[in-house]
Amino acid sequence: MKASLLNKLDILQDRFEELTALLGDAEVISDQTRFRAYSREYAEVEPVYAAYKEWCKVQGDLEGAQALLKDSDPDLREMAVEEVREAKEQLLTLESQLQRMLLPKDPNDGRNVFLEIRAGTGGDEAAIFSGDLFRMYSRYAEKRGWRLEILSENEGEHGGYKEIIARVEGENVYGKLKFESGAHRVQRVPETESQGRVHTSACTVAVLPEPDEQAAIEINPADLRVDTYRASGAGGQHVNKTDSAIRITHLPTGIVVECQEERSQHKNRARAMSWLSAKLNDMQTSAAQNAIASERKLLVGSGDRSERIRTYNYPQGRVTDHRINLTLYSLDDILSGGVEAVIEPLLAEYQADQLAALGD
């Protein structure tokens, strides 16, 4: 194992022993905030510590077996050869496991997200495709046991959505959806096309992690213009009676967010403010992420909204993710919520890229 990795593991081992002592300290136990923080860190560090302890044990076994290779007893030497082989195999497996455990964790992976889908080029067909993408993500969310709520929607004239915004809540939502941001292209024959020609349309998807109270950007109320209006669409007759929908404009940036799905103006405002905070956070981090992606030539993860990331070709039943040259002939399954078939290879490629950087 490389000296740099061993050094990291030695530091982590010291921290594990320190955390063990802290969690047994009466002063820490009486302070629930510190106790919870140390408990979370302990839960993260303990599996790595256990794997490193096992690696050290196997490394010791290997050194012992290698010493026996010089023994005058041929039977012992033969046994030692097999033990050396087994120990080396175990060490390779453990080293690979430890490398993955040491990969830097994205602090946003566990967060809920705001999912934004907008029709791009292609008019009515792009709006219809926005609806197809929204159904794909809705079914995927259902499969994973996530909760999805629509915050704002602008329906297309012939179906689908010119724009639809949803909040997705659950376990590891951003960790799974973070590479969905970008331009999604569809190639198919529209129902209105009489000559059977294939048309190309596009939609943009943005996945924004929802910040918690500590991470949320402080927003000056003087920078906001808040408008109320009557909601339309979902909500039954009630929406025609009260101005419950909220539109918030952040004057310095021109960002506009609106929420109309709740009957309570207070709830709509809270959702809109959380979404605005997520968009402002995204503005701050995207420039830095793009710089890192450019420097390291990441195959995935730049998150550029204008970057064409995926094509859905209906005549061929094909889905191609252009970032990793992945092509799957299972369009129907993917659009029915089986997008995990694309997400997992993207995550694997990103992890491989991180491993390469870790070893540099």
Swiss-Prot record:
Annotated keywords: Cytoplasm, Methylation, Protein biosynthesis
Keyword Disulfide bond among UniProt keywords: no
Main location: cytoplasm
Gene3D superfamilies: 3.30.160.20, 3.30.70.1660, 6.10.140.1950
Mod. after translation: Methylated by PrmC. Methylation increases the termination efficiency of RF1.
Protein family (similarity comment): Belongs to the prokaryotic/mitochondrial release factor family.
PANTHER family: LD18447P (PTHR43804:SF7)
Descriptive protein name: Peptide chain release factor 1
Source organism of the structure: Pseudomonas putida (strain GB-1)
